[in-house]
Amino acid sequence: AGKDWAGEENFDPDSKRLLDSACEKGFSLRHDAFGMREYYGQWERNYVKPWIMKRPVLLEGGWIVSKHPYHNDPSGYKTAKDVRIGEFEDGQEAHVNMMDFRVGDETMSWFRDAYPLVERFISEGGYRLYPDSIVVPKEMKSGSRIKIVHRWNNLGWGYCPTNIPQWNQKYKVAFALLNQDNQVVYSYLDNNTDLSVWIKGYPTSYEFTPKLHGVKKGTYTWAVALVDTTKGNGSNVKGLDISAKGTFTNSGWLKLSEVTVK
């Protein structure tokens, strides 16, 4: 009690062991002193590095700009805007999935003093999963095995934490054949997809070869979704949004192209 944790020499020897134990159980990493050079120091930065893209990191700033003497920070903050920039840059370095703007005047400060950073996080932070290339057949025969080639990008600096024990890889890519009413008639799960490894700047490609069991002849529309495998039949219920422009069905499937089954 009463111990000051600021400074690289003051951390408890058990800190890493206890934090590792929590992270291995699926806990996320959260710190409420981003932007504070003493309390979010080199020890904290070094600790978070090996967990980046393995567990979500959540940001909350340390300085309450309306009450705290942030001018004393080693970073040399002069204005509330400087503090917000420092917090944002710390979060960018840690690839945070979420930013906590606190409440009241702290929240207002983000929108009043640093709104461009709010806009940047909306467009750059967290995860934004986008298929930049999908090749599907235009014609196929019922009962045959087909090939679908698809490639995915993450446009955000964070990651999609499908690898945490609580989610247990329950989100996957699935393709569907839609009828004229945009209803899913047949769906195919690509179980080899792992959304947690989709990292910004490193597109991930897959070659999927499902077999068309019992597909009736006719014209359909190909569609793709990031499905929740714990719902529906395991391959037909959209779970996560796709960050793409295009035509989506009411149930969240991104329409691709028409296909004829002979």
Residue ranges with predicted function:
Residues 1-105:
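Catalytic-core regions of glycoside hydrolase
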Residues 6, 40-41, 48, 71, ...:
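Compositionally biased, intrinsically disordered low-complexity regions enriched in proline and serine
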Residues 12, 49, 73, 79, ...:
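Serine/threonine-rich low-complexity intrinsically disordered regions
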Residues 17, 30, 37, 45, ...:
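Arginine residue identity/basic-tract feature
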Residues 84-137:
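Catalytic cores of secreted or luminal carbohydrate-active enzymes
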Residues 122-262:
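Extracellular/luminal regions of secreted and cell-surface proteins that mediate adhesion/ECM remodeling
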